[in-house]
Amino acid sequence: MITQKEKEHLAKDKQNIYLRIISGIVLVSLFVVAILWFKTLFYILMILVGLGMLSEWCNMTSSSIHYLLIGFIIIPIPISLLIFLSTQESNRLVIMLYFCIIWSVDTFAMIGGKTFKGTKLAPKISPKKTWTGLIIGTISAGLIAVLVSLIPYYHIENYYFSNKIYLFIISCILALIAQSSDLFISYFKRKFNIKDSGHIIPGHGGVLDRFDSIILTAPVFFGINIYL
């Protein structure tokens, strides 16, 4: 028998998933429009994201100057790298792919974990994450990247992103790093005893909760674009 409390918890989880999906669609749509057609808007969005992440980081780590200063290193760097890459017209489609990858792994890892359960990935840091969710999220991100690249007139100049096999492999690697980045920030949230960094994005929490994956993935993504 399921208790009333458990029913309420399940209903809340279901509502949270719907909110997460809806707000995710809105965010993705906004960023796709900005990346493809309004470069200046993308710059503004990324600066606002960076400021939002820094604000939430400062609120979270205000009791420790050492941890507070870490945020002024790990947040501006990925934001700056993504803005720099976007200045090149040839990178706009690849950047769109990048956001599709890091956001799809997060969404499908959550759906996969809640649907199929399984062994906990890092119970002390992020109790809801599972190995099953990680695998489903990673593979889904790779497949979505390939599917998006099949859109007619969708031409990518970078060979490693235009080749479907390489794209799938790179996408899976970025997806795994995105989940590692998520756990990295979750470690600090646990350390300072907070669940969400904020509540500005429905279903996601704060800006840091939604964009934490760029902290580790953006430098890798930048390296791939520059050196491959």
UniProtKB/Swiss-Prot annotation:
Which pairs of positions does the record mark as disulfide bonds?
Answer: none
The gene name reads cdsA
* One Gene Ontology biological process: CDP-diacylglycerol biosynthetic process
Lineage summary: Bacteria, Pseudomonadati, Pseudomonadota, Alphaproteobacteria, Rickettsiales
Membrane topology for this entry?
Answer: Multi-pass membrane protein
The reply on keyword Transferase is yes
- Where is it mostly found? membrane
**InterPro entries given for it?**
PC_trans (IPR000374)
Q: Report the protein name in the record.
A: Phosphatidate cytidylyltransferase
**The protein's annotated pathway:** Phospholipid metabolism; CDP-diacylglycerol biosynthesis; CDP-diacylglycerol from sn-glycerol 3-phosphate: step 3/3
